Structures are given as C-alpha cells and as structure tokens.
Amino acid sequence: MASQGTKRSYEQMETGGERQNATEIRASVGRMVGGIGRFYVQMCTELKLNDHEGRLIQNSITIERMVLSAFDERRNKYLEEHPSAGKDPKKTGGPIYRRKDGKWMRELILHDKEEIMRIWRQANNGEDATAGLTHMMIWHSNLNDTTYQRTRALVRAGMDPRMCSLMQGSTLPRRSGAAGAAVKGVGTMVMELIRMIKRGINDRNFWRGENGRRTRIAYERMCNILKGKFQTAAQRAMMDQVREGRNPGNAEIEDLIFLARSALILRGSVAHKSCLPACVYGLAVASGYDFEKEGYSLVGIDPFKLLQNSQIFSLIRPKENPAHKSQLVWMACHSAAFEDLRVLNFIRGTKVIPRGQLATRGVQIASNENMETIDSSTLELRSRYWAIRTRSGGNTSQQRASAGQISVQPTFSVQRNLPFERATIMAAFTGNTERRTSDMRTEIIRMMENARSEDVSFQGRGVFELSDEKATNPIVPSFDMSNEGSYFFGDNAEEFDS
C-alpha cells in the first residue's frame, strides 16, 4: 500500500483535513491530541482530582465517556423523546475514584452535558473537534478488542468464532466517521452488513420508502468501505456483486461470510493507530508540552515516547496480576490485539502472553464491586523498541497457527512470516455446495491455496531503537516460528456484552 495516490492518509481522516503535507499533518494531529489533553486537565480541576487521581486510568475512562456521551446527538435526542426513569437526558456521569485515608473510594458523579461540551470546546479553540472525540472512541474500541472476545456476536452472524482476528473495531459506534471506518476489520464490516441484511429479510419495509432509500445508501457505503479493504481484484469484484444485489438476502450473506473467511489468508488492509487514554495527553500538557508546535503522529515513534515517560495507575482487584493488567493496556494503546505475540514480545522487550493466561479482568470496575479490597498499581507501558504501525494486511504465507485464533492481523510493519492454519481455513470452503458458484470464488480459493510460507511480509521492515527517531536503522528480528503466536489462542476471555 505504498502508492497512496489520491488516498488521504489516516492522519488526514483523523483530523478531517484535506490533503496536507507531512508537517501540516503532524501539526493537526498534534492539535487534536493537545485538545484532548487540555480538556482532561480542565476536567481534573473541575472535579477536584489531585495528581495521583488524575493519573488513574479508570478516572480517565469515565471522563472520556462523559464527553462522548455529551456529544452523542442521536442518543441525546432519543433520551429526550423517550424519558426513562432515573435518566436525566441533560446530565452525564460515571464513577470517579478518590484516595481517602489510604483507601480508594468510588463516587458517582453527574455533570451537565452542556457544561462538559463547553469545557471541551474551550479546550479545542471553540470548535467541536470531532476528530478528538473519534480518537477517544478508537482508544475505547482498542481496549475492548484487547479485553474481550466476540465469539457470541460472530456466532449470531453465522461466522466462525475463530475468525476473531478480523474483528478489530467491532464495538466502535457507527458515528465514528472515516477514521473509525479505517480501523474496522473485515469481519466487523461483514458483521454490520449481515445484521443489516437480516433486518431487511425480517422487515418488509426496511428497504422501502424514503427511509429505505437512506438505508440503501448506507448499505452501499458500507459495501464500498469493505471493498476498499480488500487487496485482490476477485474479492473486490465479489463486493460489487454484494453491493449491487437488487434485494439483499441469503445469497449476499453467503458471499460476505465467504469473503470474511478468505480474508484470513488474503488479508484486508486495516489501519492501526496508537490511541492513548486522555490522562496521558493531559499529563504532557500539564507539564508544558506543546503538541501542536512539536507535531505528533499516531503511527510513528511519538506514542512510544509519550508512554516512556508517563506514569499512570490502574485499580487492581485482589486476584489480578498488575503485570498482566499492564500488558492488556499496553496492547490496547498500540491497537495490537490481533498482532502476532512474537512481534509484540520483541517490541515490548518483555514476554507477552495469550489472553487466556492473563490474570486480569477488564480495566473498568463495575458499580457493585466492593472497593474495600481494591488497590492500585503503576501500569508498565514502556517498550524496548518502536515500530511503524501498518495499514496493510501484509502478504500471506503458510505458517502454523492455533486452535483458538487461526490468523493474525498485523499492527506493526515488521518483516515476518504471517501465521495461519491453511488446513483449518480451507476446510471451511469445502462441503456446502448450494451457494452461488462463480469465477470469483474459484479465483479466490485458488489464490488462497497458492499462498506460500516463503512469502515474507513487510520485506526489510524492522523495529527501531527508541533513540532512532527518524527510523534510519531497522533491526529485523528473527522469530521462532515453532512457538504459538496468537493472543486469543484456545481462549476463555470474557465476552463483550453490548
């Protein structure tokens, strides 16, 4: 994906800008994260959080959720039209944790949405700064991707739960714009389309009338987004067929599931960016760092440098392992839930273990959990090396992969063979003959069968020392391919309940 041509880089999508040169992009991304930081500092003042409390990731998440909720116009309108008991449509809030007498106390706060919107705009030069809001949504999405599996959702859509590596961004709200669409995995887009088609099958009026026309436009737009993620002509041609379907139904669902499976080997291009919790940007702003002046990139060294010198904390439950909690958050910060663990081991410089072996639950604490036994510890978010984030799926090769997750979706441009279990994947394409046959299908299956293990992805790309800011001396790591490389391997992570 080197020849970007007329495509906007995802930094430009992120900041809603037209084509800009590298310096302008760095400045506008800097302005975006600086705005998040200024807002966070202001909210800490507003809520009277001391330095330690402001560095608590749970407080950061509550503050992020409050501003996202304040700007969620559709939900706000819905709440006003359907008043429910105990929900004030004009207020938003959540748990804030304070340190009192050597213990963490939970306090449920409520704030006027108007007031929060005012603080947000003030921190962003009077603008709505939707790019910053989307950035926080992507951070929450990356955290969900790292914490939960989507087995139930996959099964509901008729997809194989082992296709979890395609599910990046599956909890992102629809309103997350172009930057949100860029980070959604192939499986996520397929699932959204299948849900839509199923509604059409069950509801005669779904595609009819003025509303139906709008639905159809949304359907075709989603098809085009998914088509843009595929890197082969045959996959794209199949997407055209799905998009042009007169009356989308089971044939289209079949095609979409076929395409999702094919993406396990013929990978789609999915953007990755390091989105950090608001408190990290807040700390930098509070220490006088000028993001806009210095410039910032979500896909280069900047997030790594920021995490090298940010000390943030997390609440820890009695049976949880603080090192494991750190790994969870570190992976989320770099959008690396579906990356090969061998690559992550190398970059982080400490052993990265599969989700099922992590002694940690999600970051957020439920309101019914007992605070008496809850402690806090520092999150270790530093890395040994850094690497450039990728938006390409890499080319595909035949490698051993696991029972729980049968493919990876690379996050970093680092030279390696990409693992996948060809036998398992190809087995999914035999049998079941009552579907449409087409040249495209035959062509896709042929390409999948011919994917070779000698093909190395990201030729010559490596990791860099943290002192090598300009990425001049790549270190190409060699990986032990006999080891297991997938994160959701034979896993028992909690389900994400939407």
From Swiss-Prot:
Modifications made to the protein after synthesis: Late in virus-infected cells, may be cleaved from a 56-kDa protein to a 53-kDa protein by a cellular caspase. This cleavage might be a marker for the onset of apoptosis in infected cells or have a specific function in virus host interaction.
Principal location class: virion
Places the protein is found: Virion; Host nucleus
Pfam families per UniProt: Flu_NP (PF00506)
Disordered: annotated span: 1-21
GO molecular function: RNA binding; structural molecule activity
GO annotation terms (biological process): symbiont entry into host cell; viral penetration into host nucleus
Motif Unconventional nuclear localization signal, residue range(s) on this chain: 1-18
KW Translocase (keyword) present: no
Highest taxon of source: Viruses
Motif (Bipartite nuclear localization signal): 198-216
Coiled coil location: none
Keywords associated with the record: Capsid protein, Helical capsid protein, Host nucleus, Host-virus interaction, Ribonucleoprotein, RNA-binding, Viral nucleoprotein, Viral penetration into host nucleus, Virion, Virus entry into host cell
Family annotation (InterPro entries): Flu_NP (IPR002141)
Gene Ontology terms: cellular component: helical viral capsid; host cell; host cell nucleus; ribonucleoprotein complex; viral nucleocapsid
Task of the protein: Encapsidates the negative strand viral RNA, protecting it from nucleases. The encapsidated genomic RNA is termed the ribonucleoprotein (RNP) and serves as template for transcription and replication. The RNP needs to be localized in the host nucleus to start an infectious cycle, but is too large to diffuse through the nuclear pore complex. NP comprises at least 2 nuclear localization signals that are responsible for the active RNP import into the nucleus through cellular importin alpha/beta pathway.
Subunit structure: Homomultimerizes to form the nucleocapsid. May bind host exportin-1/XPO1. Binds to viral genomic RNA. Protein-RNA contacts are mediated by a combination of electrostatic interactions between positively charged residues and the phosphate backbone and planar interactions between aromatic side chains and bases.
Family of this protein: Belongs to the influenza viruses nucleoprotein family.
Protein's recorded name: Nucleoprotein
Organism encoding this protein: Influenza A virus (strain A/Equine/Kentucky/2/1986 H3N8)
